[in-house]
Regions:
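Amphipathic alpha-helical interaction elements
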Residues: 16, 30, 127-130
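Conserved phosphate-coupling serine/threonine residues in phosphotransfer and NTP-handling enzymes
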Residues: 56
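Hydrophobic alpha-helical core bundles mediating ligand binding, dimerization, or RNAP-core interactions
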Residues: 6-10, 25-28, 59-66
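Helix-loop "lid/cap" segments that line or gate small-molecule binding pockets
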Residues: 1-16
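A generic secondary-structure signal
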Residues: 13, 41-44, 101
């Protein structure tokens, strides 16, 4: 979704003007940063030999900002930003797009997300799912699953 459409949808829901919402949306990117500990998990997964891909429900302006200011994208082989493919999680279509683009499928594909219904959608699609709640919880889950060493 682009900034204009996002602003229109949110403004309508919360009762503010579209212009006010656009201003707010445009001010957010500089505040985006990875959670402490998550980049280390990406690095460790990559070092363990896992191919990493991302699916992100993010407006195009946020995606561009993150790509140009953060180096954690180096750990990913590829990814999909919803704004660029005009499809969002939890739509089954975005998981199909990912299967085709990344050449992945089935239980060997592990989907990690902080939104439970997105994880459930991935599981319905046949992927294994991990509901992210904190870096500590994620690391422990990955260790328990033998995807990372303790």
């Amino acid at each position: 979704i682009d900034t204009e459409n996002l602003a229109t949808q949110i403004a309508h829901r919360v009762g503010v003007s579209k212009a006010e919402m656009e201003t707010l949306i445009e001010s957010i990117p500089q505040h985006l940063a990875p959670l402490k500990g998550t980049v280390k998990i990406l690095s460790d997964l990559k070092s363990a030999g896992h191919d990493l891909f991302f699916l992100s429900n993010m407006p195009a302006s946020y995606a561009h900002y993150l790509e140009s200011t953060h180096d954690f994208f180096q750990y990913f082989s590829d990814g999909l930003f919803s704004a660029r493919v005009q499809c969002i999680k939890p739509s089954a279509k975005i998981f199909e797009m990912a299967n085709n683009k990344f050449k992945v499928s089935g239980k060997n594909t592990i989907f990690i997300d902080d939104v439970k219904h997105n994880v459930e959608a991935a599981e319905l699609h046949g992927w294994a799912g991990i509901w992210f709640q904190s870096p500590t919880q994620l690391r422990q889950t990955l260790v328990n699953s033998q995807l990372l060493k303790a």
